[in-house]
Amino acid sequence: YKYDDATDPLRNKDVFTVFQNQKSVAELPVKDFYFAWWGAPADGVQADRFATVSTTTFEVQAGQYVLELDSDDGARLYLDDQLLINHWDVHEASTDEATVSLKGPHRLRIEHFEAGGFSTLGFRMRPLR
């Protein structure tokens, strides 16, 4: 999604509610969730001031899991609509994590915005050993 001053996610943190009701500029089905952008993430998307919303469903065996989220700039991770990671500011590339007990089917949503320059977004999930 493209954003402007009126829909800037830092000034209007609920902007993704509006974005999710609009047609996306680009959709990219992926198997591995890691992106690094020095420019536009896809045709038709500007190089700076863009936002992404990523969703998936998955099923796991019972256990403790570590969810890792790499981001530059802001990112939020929701599991079953519960906010687990909230790094919603302009920052250099960093990794945040949350440890959770899971079993069965779940929904994951990652919201991300890029303010300018380099941008990265990645997600990994691993069992806690």
Tell me the role of every PLM-derived stretch.
Residues 1-66, 70-129:
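Extracellular/secretory pathway-exposed regions associated with glycan biology
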